[in-house]
């Protein structure tokens, strides 16, 4: 066997892990449908490292509220949904205080859309909409999420405005 015949498989074996690593580290792409909808709605946004859309809204009384429209979708059977997130509370310890956790559970029960979830040290309102929602439907989900989350933030933090 010629030495060059052994060289090709060796080079190929060395190149494959590097190519796989490049694929793993490539940033997820932002959903073009969501981008077009947000632009049509006139919303300013930035795309984060996960490929999600980060929006900041000015609200009444000088308050502001953060929202994310997640590019990736979730599926269950024939359903495909997209999430709109809006944070409202950050805990300082390992767990939410009991009164805060109970208030979030109560709000999840009585709310019209979405539910409160724990995301690391934050309470986040997550509203799920059809992945193919219209611009108007996405707008309604965003509006609901930011207003409800801002109200909960004001309630739980005595009027602070972190998000």
Regions found by a protein language model. Name each.
Residues 1-8:
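Bacterial N-terminal signal peptides that target proteins for export
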Residues 15-17:
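N-terminal signal peptide c-region/cleavage motif recognized by signal peptidases
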Residues 25-32, 95, 132-139:
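Soluble non-cytosolic domains of exported or imported proteins
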Residues 81-122:
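Short, internal acidic amphipathic alpha-helical interface segments
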Residues 21-77:
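N-terminal secretory signal peptides
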Residues 49-51, 59, 71-73, 85-88, ...:
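A mature extracytoplasmic/lumenal domain signature
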Residues 157-163:
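Short, highly charged C-terminal tails/helix-capping segments
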Residues 106-153:
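A short, solvent-exposed beta-edge/loop patch
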